[in-house]
Swiss-Prot record:
Active site: S474
Gene3D superfamilies in the cross-refs: IlvD/EDD C-terminal domain-like
Family statement drawn from the similarity comment of this UniProt entry: Belongs to the IlvD/Edd family.
Protein name, entry field: Dihydroxy-acid dehydratase
Protein keywords: 2Fe-2S, Amino-acid biosynthesis, Branched-chain amino acid biosynthesis, Iron, Iron-sulfur, Lyase, Magnesium, Metal-binding
Residues engaged in binding [2Fe-2S] cluster: C52, C125, C197
Obligatory cofactor(s): [2Fe-2S] cluster; Mg(2+)
Length: 560
């Protein structure tokens, strides 16, 4: 008996009572034969206003052509996106994290309303990646991700530069390290064309995580956006989705607990973004896999950082592509027993089978260190708890900035206040900068603090101050930084009670973050604290404030 591949779409195309549905489909140009083909949603996060996403419609057309060669019907649709790079440092960043859940909601909506049989998602920028994955997990229909790809490095006066060079140029100009003319030249040359920000920032981090999970084709995460190989990846989309339909392999068959462990190992080795903690928690929630922030610490305790990527290192993702790509790194880890090779992937094969014929990394490469010569012996993503963060926080400690910082609090109730203080020279060596009321509800949307960290680095204070926040950090942030502090200030967390001059200890060796205050003093301050007025009174941010969970559970919006 022939297997039914259009088990969802036939509800509309083969049911005589659905004449209006069929009339509209005929009106789109479908013919009698098309009515019996499986329908594949091709969900692109295309929009013109961002290098990460500007080319995705073109990739979507390549995917549609590939799908239709396999006697399937491709149905392209779009969802929304937010450019973190463009909105960074403004109130627009409040819309970034919530766009992740809007992307998941909108893809789920289109797929479910139109009864598509499978989904190929094409994300480009940071929150696109987990948003698409959360939709795939919720729907649990055959599908996978094609990453839009990484940007090539910019070049200025013979040296490679990227988006973080542009962010740091303002602080460098303020401190006299570069001229205004050099700043202008930097921002004009940092982004040479299509593709996501080139270092191990959030988009590339999540692309690596998705490939390690088995939810994208091999090499997807490291293939540059404008390369021939990215077009070839799109050309494989049709046979890949058809194979998934025929074998009835669904996301929940692939996105298992062991697959998430593979993802956590790879992003640690790669020196990935703190945002991966939030996003992997949310992705796991979408498929009912039990994952907690403590699991990230367990992985960090036994996994080294090996990749010398920007922002704290030298290289960008396109450099890795040139020496074998992400699969070459995973093959090294598999040989070392650090990955679960028996995990199923969207190729229909196991991870080990996918990696069997992948070439090893070149012996003399300087991008990925050998296991016996790590950049850091344990993971850079450290989960810190203590009286400042009883529910946890996430520190990004590469080792270059040290592992323990003791200093006095310099407290700001917004990102803007802190930026003004740096401009006025009011941030000093030894400060623990506190930026609060920037959490999931308080921000709202937990905006990223890349502008403050870039100012700190640009001003030459990277080794001399620490920054803690209930907001997030961009993958481009580096320095002694701790984010995702929970409970957040808006909900009366300890970070709301900190005052200028408080002595704070951040210890990434013992995984603690504490303020030197007695329980009596903390209780006294708590009794005087009053919740601030919500920053959003209507619209999408108002809804987000009402539904978003704590950073310690991934900031999801569909929990009970």
């Amino acid at each position: 008996m022939k297997k039914v591949l259009n088990k969802y779409s036939r509800r509309l195309t083969e049911d005589k009572s659905q004449g209006a549905s069929q009339a509209m489909l005929y009106g789109t140009g479908m013919n009698d034969a098309d009515m019996h083909k499986p329908q594949i949603g091709i969900g692109s996060v295309w929009y013109e206003g961002n290098t990460c996403n500007m080319h995705l419609n073109q990739l979507a057309q390549f995917v549609k052509d590939s799908v239709e060669k396999e006697n399937l019907k491709g149905m392209r649709f779009n969802t929304i996106g937010v450019s973190d790079g463009i909105s960074m440092g403004t109130d627009g960043m409040s819309y970034s994290l919530q766009s992740r859940d809007l992307i998941a909601d909108s893809i789920e909506t289109v797929m479910s309303a139109h009864w598509y049989d499978g989904l190929i998602s094409i994300p480009g920028c940071d929150k696109n990646m987990p948003g698409c994955m959360m939709a795939l997990g919720r729907l649990n229909r055959p599908g996978f991700v094609i990453y839009g790809g990484t940007i090539q490095a910019g070049v200025m006066r013979g040296k490679p530069i990227d988006i973080v060079t542009a962010f740091q140029s303002y602080g460098a100009c303020l401190s006299g390290q570069i001229t205004e003319q050099e700043r202008q030249e930097t921002i004009k040359k940092a982004c040479p064309g299509a593709g996501a920000c080139g270092g191990m920032y959030t988009a590339n981090t999540m692309a690596c995580a998705i490939e390690a999970l088995g939810m994208s084709l091999p090499f997807s995460s490291s293939t540059p956006a404008t390369s021939v190989e990215k077009v070839q990846e799109c050309d494989k989309a049709g046979e890949t989705i058809k194979n998934l339909l025929e074998l009835d392999i669904k996301p929940r068959d692939i996105m298992t607990r062991k697959a998430f462990e593979n993802a956590m190992v790879l992003i640690t080795v790669m020196g990935g973004s703190t945002n991966a903690v939030l996003h992997l928690l949310a992705m796991a929630s979408s498929v009912d896999v039990d994952l907690s922030i403590d699991d990230f610490q367990e992985i960090a305790n036994k996994t080294p950082v090996l990749a010398d990527f920007k922002p704290s290192g030298k290289y960008v993702m396109a450099d890795l592509h040139a020496i074998g790509g992400t699969p070459a790194v995973m093959k090294m880890l598999l040989k070392a027993g650090m990955l679960h090779g028996d995990c199923l992937t969207v190729t229909g094969k196991t991870l080990a089978e996918n990696l069997e014929n992948v070439a090893d990394l070149p012996e003399d490469n300087t991008i990925i260190h050998k296991l016996d010569n790590p950049i850091k012996k344990t993971g850079h993503l450290q989960i810190l708890k203590g009286n400042v963060a009883p529910e946890g926080s996430v520190a990004k400690i590469t080792g270059k900035e040290g592992e323990v910082f003791e200093g006095v609090a310099n407290v700001f109730d917004s990102e803007e206040e802190m930026v003004a203080a740096v401009e006025e020279g009011k941030v000093k060596k030894g400060d623990v900068i506190v930026i609060r009321y920037e959490g999931p509800k308080g921000g709202p949307g937990m905006p990223e603090m890349l502008k403050p960290t870039s100012l700190i680095m640009g001003a030459g204070l990277g080794q001399d101050v620490a920054l803690i926040t209930d907001g997030r950090f961009s993958g481009g942030s580096h320095g002694f930084i701790v984010g995702h502090i929970a409970p957040e200030a808006y909900e009366g967390g300890m970070i709301a009670l900190l005052e200028n001059g408080d002595k704070i200890t951040i210890d990434a060796i013992n995984n603690v973050i504490n303020v030197d205050l007695s329980d009596q003093e903390i209780a006294q301050r708590k009794s005087k604290w009053r919740a601030p007025k919500q920053k959003a009174s209507r619209g999408t941010l108002k809804k987000y404030i009402k539904t978003v969970s704590s950073a310690s559970t991934g900031c999801v919006t569909d929990l009970d």
